[in-house]
């Protein structure tokens, strides 16, 4: 049976349909907004796998290029490995949905959102999250939703729900928010140095609209008559749990007071082994032994949270708002164009900057067409950074997500391309990690950019905030959380910015939402922490280096008429190749007539720029030029005085004395000085070597 409902979501009319397509999925909805058509489907296994002790959720967002009437690129002409922007939207769907499944529900769930028809004006991220929530809400799969997503922009101080792709270009805020009817559950985005108050205002605006779409989903589920599956939870052995707590509580409490991550992990491991060995004497059932390991983890969770909430004590002895010790190194590597090492506690990031030219732009394909990026930040998280052994492979979703967050934090303080025409790549190598490595990447990246001579608007620092709360409403906000506090806490909120304001943010929860009072505390405490970090960073470097590294390319930019680009390129690229061969410089020509000239040194770049100028310079009568003899005739020599512009130096104008043969004085390939005597209406140029010699 087909069910349809429609409703207004800001300026958009949303139509939801189910019961016609993908009927064998456990939940499926066709979601429409304008010409945008999404298909969201979800399926779940009937039972958890034997021994499963975590929730295996997979969220996949896919853009089909047929949705805009285009073929995929490449040899096979079909969609292949998901590009970075699809992975990022997949994460936007995953992160707010994951904590809303019942605790202890370990059945495998696969959620897919596909773009079947695209609308160039419609930004997809918020709609994709909405479609995913609808599919789950109308399915029989247990889910403590619905939630809704909203993308928020701001133009001239006015907040906009779900801005168009054109509007977002002019917005000083790009925020994606997910929430329930009453609480925010996820935020992500970037801003042009917005204040805490402006950010909170945008979140309140989003929450109001989110509640509207949540209500629509509730009405839809009621119309369909959804009946959810019963959650099958494993029975707990209360008696065994009490015995484990009695034996292990003091031991785990002592082990948790160790501030060093490596030592602490070893001590916790030793306690766990001791407890298991002790109970093996009286417990023979292998499943009960597995339960003991689960109870030990729960006990550790209880100990860490009790210390923070009731004693105001963190495992490493810090105050709730205290930041770990910070150290900074500037340009520790001699080869790269700029580098830094930022260490905060046991988290360490090596930031490295490479400056490139237009040909180094990253090109990628989206539903809107081919795009280019001139700034990129790549985040690497090797196994050794956490003392583990695992196979090295390409970047996973986590690395891509962390790199994107750090990239957005730094992107908005970069100079305009007119001021600094370089392509910039920042790499963050995580050398060791104990929480907040993405924010360490922001700090090391900011330092390395200044060290490389990139004139950024100001230093950028990032901090990760945590939250511990209980059912009574009591809560504690933690600054600069370590890995343990991230693992056992309720929130991981990353905020990056300058002294003027916030540039990037990301918040994930393990609870069903936080109030605005809590968010206000988080933002205020994060700002104090950010300023503290900036104070330390700016003691080491507070402005861009005065000069670029010797190995960095030297770039000169020229702008030429768009309708004359072909003249510069020449037949088959002849002119551009000629300039490169003569000067050693490279030319990158854009469709708007912008020409980026890069050389290994300033002389090379200037020589090439002079040649480019020559293509578009007008020949001046009376001016002396240095030109190359291109051809010799009986009556004179043809000399190229500007690229593509030849004139005739008649035999009578070659020398002061009588010349019997032109070849007696000049040869092909010679560089000679000539004076322009005349340019006629047809463009013929009359040259004189003799007149030029007279003026030496």
Swiss-Prot record:
Molecular function as annotated in GO: 3'-5'-RNA exonuclease activity; magnesium ion binding; polyribonucleotide nucleotidyltransferase activity; RNA binding
From the UniProt record, list the coiled-coil ranges: none
Query: What GO cellular component entries does it have?
Result: cytosol
What the entry lists under InterPro entries is as follows: ExoRNase_PH_dom1, ExoRNase_PH_dom2, ExoRNase_PH_dom2_sf, KH_dom, KH_dom_type_1, KH_dom_type_1_sf, NA-bd_OB-fold, PNPase
Which superkingdom does the taxonomy of this entry point to? Answer: Bacteria
Concerning CDD domains, the annotation shows: KH-I_PNPase, RNase_PH_PNPase_1, RNase_PH_PNPase_2, S1_PNPase
Q: Which reaction does it catalyse?
A: RNA(n+1) + phosphate = RNA(n) + a ribonucleoside 5'-diphosphate
Tell me the ranges covered by the S1 motif domain, including all copies. 622-690
Q: Which cofactor does it need?
A: Mg(2+)
Residues bound to Mg(2+) are 486, 492
Per the UniProt entry, the disulfide pairs are: none
Record PANTHER family: POLYRIBONUCLEOTIDE NUCLEOTIDYLTRANSFERASE (PTHR11252), POLYRIBONUCLEOTIDE NUCLEOTIDYLTRANSFERASE 1, MITOCHONDRIAL (PTHR11252:SF0)
Q: What does this protein do?
A: Involved in mRNA degradation. Catalyzes the phosphorolysis of single-stranded polyribonucleotides processively in the 3'- to 5'-direction.
HAMAP family with a match to the protein in the record: PNPase (MF_01595)
Q: What is this protein called?
A: Polyribonucleotide nucleotidyltransferase
Identify the gene encoding this protein.
Answer: pnp
